[in-house]
């Protein structure tokens, strides 16, 4: 706010200024802040004779012009006065704050009134009570948000677990898994069909068990087999040779002590020679451009089983369903490895009556909801039911059923599938 300045009233043309020389002389020795006595204002008669000045002190009530004279004196006094040091800018004056914030205070008061009104407890009506009871009866009330379990907390000190990067690693696996999926190749294979492929994969499961190989080796073997068949026609008589060479390559890649070529010749009952296996191995590698580092089903199974917090029985059930899905051509073509792995978890939890079937932790780490998994999970449950029906009618068991019917694997192949996945209903 700027300081208001006094406006000097314009002198009338009738005013006469009389200068007293005596007072002027005295003004040279006048003290600071002294009275300026050499200016006298007033109206005089037309004969230019000044009226006699009354030397009695006049008050402001007797002569209002003294107020103007006081205002005239102030600038002169300030001009001759010793300049005061400049004041450092400080807080605004109280008057200014009051004037500026007067409107805002009213606004704050209105806001406070609104907030107070909003915080008032709403009156509970009979209709709202009935609505809440109806929702509770129908199970429509909001469930408390389930907490996501930190499945890597126990592996913080394990450098091989790569806890800092594990989330990024699996995000990368999911982003590239579709690049290495085999396409639908049966139409381009004149001599083989889906049944022949199923027989070959089940035979590879038996060979895998006999050599006591790691699970990674089996899933990589099937991946190499399907990728090769999707780009190169193979005669029926060489189909088993392709499977043997794919197994040899996978074992060299995954195992510390892979089986020898002679062992593969023996297990194939000398149907193929040592040289034929090595030549086919070279043909497959050149066809696939030596690219063997791919995200297989096992890569996702290892992570998803950990997220499921599964015991040994659950883990064997998951592997049984996953291998069952890999055996069937339609499952391999229709669904990605991560989808099959997640669906195997869902179908296994359904068969073993785990509650809840699908948790927030599983949804977070798999990236799939129950709705997304339902088609693949139903297909796995149907294949599980069909294998059990065929096994009960036949005197011999298939390699997969035999493998998972043992007590050391909790005989998970004998556990019936969940009825909910077979009938399509929500209740098991």
From Swiss-Prot:
Matching Pfam families: Cyclin_C, Cyclin_N
Alphabetically, the GO molecular function entries are: cyclin-dependent protein serine/threonine kinase regulator activity
Q: Primary place of residence? A: nucleus
Q: In which compartments does the protein localize?
A: Nucleus
Subunit relationships: Interacts with FZR2/CCS52A1, FZR1/CCS52A2 and FZR3/CCS52B.
Family of this protein:
Belongs to the cyclin family. Cyclin AB subfamily.
- Protein name per UniProt: Cyclin-B1-1
UniProt organism field: Arabidopsis thaliana (Mouse-ear cress)
């Amino acid at each position: 706010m700027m300081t208001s300045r006094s406006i000097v009233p314009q002198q009338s043309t009738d005013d006469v200024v009389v200068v007293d020389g005596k007072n002027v002389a005295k003004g040279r020795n006048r003290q600071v802040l002294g009275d300026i006595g050499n200016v006298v204002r007033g109206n005089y008669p037309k004969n230019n004779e000044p009226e006699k000045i009354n030397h009695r002190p006049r008050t402001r009530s007797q002569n209002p012009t003294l107020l103007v004279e006081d205002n005239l004196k102030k600038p002169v006094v300030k001009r001759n006065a010793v300049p005061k040091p400049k004041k450092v800018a400080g807080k605004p004056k109280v008057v200014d704050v009051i004037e500026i914030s007067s409107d805002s205070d009213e606004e704050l008061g209105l806001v406070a009134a609104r907030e107070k009104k909003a915080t008032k407890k709403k009156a509970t009506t009979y209709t709202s009570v009935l609505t809440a009871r109806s929702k509770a009866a129908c199970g429509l009330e909001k469930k408390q948000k389930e907490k996501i379990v930190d499945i890597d907390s126990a592996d913080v000190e394990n450098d091989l677990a790569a806890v800092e990067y594990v989330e990024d690693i699996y995000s990368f696996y999911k982003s590239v898994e579709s690049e290495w999926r085999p396409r639908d190749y049966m139409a381009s294979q004149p001599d083989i069909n889906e049944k022949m492929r199923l027989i070959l994969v089940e035979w590879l499961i038996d060979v895998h068990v006999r050599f006591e190989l790691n699970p990674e080796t089996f899933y990589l073997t099937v991946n190499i087999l399907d990728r090769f068949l999707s780009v190169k026609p193979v005669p029926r008589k060489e189909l088993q040779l392709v499977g043997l060479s794919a197994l040899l390559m996978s074992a060299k890649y995954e195992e510390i002590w892979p089986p020898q070529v002679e062992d593969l010749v023996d297990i194939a009952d000398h149907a193929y020679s040592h040289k034929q296996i090595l030549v086919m191995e070279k043909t497959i590698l050149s066809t696939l451009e030596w690219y063997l580092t791919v995200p297989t089903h096992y890569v996702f199974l290892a992570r998803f089983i950990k997220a499921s917090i599964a015991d040994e029985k659950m883990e064997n059930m998951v592997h049984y369903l996953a291998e069952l899905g890999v055996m069937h051509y339609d499952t391999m073509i229709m669904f990605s490895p991560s989808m099959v792995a997640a669906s195997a978890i869902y179908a296994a939890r359904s068969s073993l009556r785990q509650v809840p079937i699908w948790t927030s932790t599983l949804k977070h780490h798999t990236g799939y909801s129950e709705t997304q998994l339902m088609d693949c999970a139903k297909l796995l449950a149907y294949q599980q039911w069909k294998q059990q029906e065929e096994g009960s009618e036949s005197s011999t068991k298939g390699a997969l059923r035999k493998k998972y019917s043992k007590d050391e694997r909790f005989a998970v192949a004998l556990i019936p599938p969940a009825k909910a996945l077979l009938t399509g209903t929500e209740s098991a």
